[in-house]
Amino acid sequence: QLAELKYVI
């Protein structure tokens, strides 16, 4: 879940 937000960077 949070991992996907890290890919946004």
Curated annotation (Swiss-Prot):
Spell out the GO cellular component terms annotated for this protein, sorted alphabetically and separated by semicolons.
extracellular region
Domain of life here?
Answer: Eukaryota
Compartments annotated for it: namely: Secreted, Cell wall
The protein's predominant localisation is secreted
Keywords noted in UniProt: Cell wall, Secreted
User: What is this protein identified as?
Assistant: 58 kDa cell wall protein
